């Protein structure tokens, strides 16, 4: 293969790698809601996210009183521990675990207490 052919091949490979890196993420992915963490510095502190005390950690916010307190693609959930958290919303389990390892998978569940009502939604619930 001549040099020009190699350049074309490398250009195609670079384009393919860039396209695969873009993903199908939503606002919650971009903001890190639901991501696994071990400390607050791994969460989006500009958006007041903290590493919540769940198994594997969970980047989110606590103390919300309504969905508007949470970033887009997340909702205010009254957890069984009595605290309100902003958890990412989901359609299926895969959406919950893009940024979590298999040992700390979250579940996409409709069996949570949405502060403003479920309205057919589900949320990514981290393991306890």
What are these regions (language model features)?
Residues 1-20:
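Sec-dependent bacterial lipoprotein signal peptides
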Residues 22-128:
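Secreted, cysteine-rich disulfide-bonded mini-domains of extracellular proteins
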């Amino acid at each position: 293969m001549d040099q020009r052919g190699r350049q074309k091949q490398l250009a195609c490979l670079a384009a393919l790698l860039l396209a695969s890196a873009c993903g199908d993420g939503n606002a919650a992915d971009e903001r890190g809601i639901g991501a696994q963490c071990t400390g607050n510095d791994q969460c989006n502190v500009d958006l007041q996210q903290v590493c919540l005390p769940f198994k594997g950690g969970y980047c989110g916010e606590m103390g919300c009183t309504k969905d508007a307190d949470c970033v887009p693609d997340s909702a205010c959930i009254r957890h069984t521990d009595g605290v309100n958290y902003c958890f990412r919303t989901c359609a299926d389990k895969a959406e919950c675990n893009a940024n979590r390892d298999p040992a700390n998978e979250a579940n996409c569940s409709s069996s949570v207490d949405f502060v403003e009502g479920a309205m057919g939604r589900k949320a990514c619930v981290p393991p306890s």
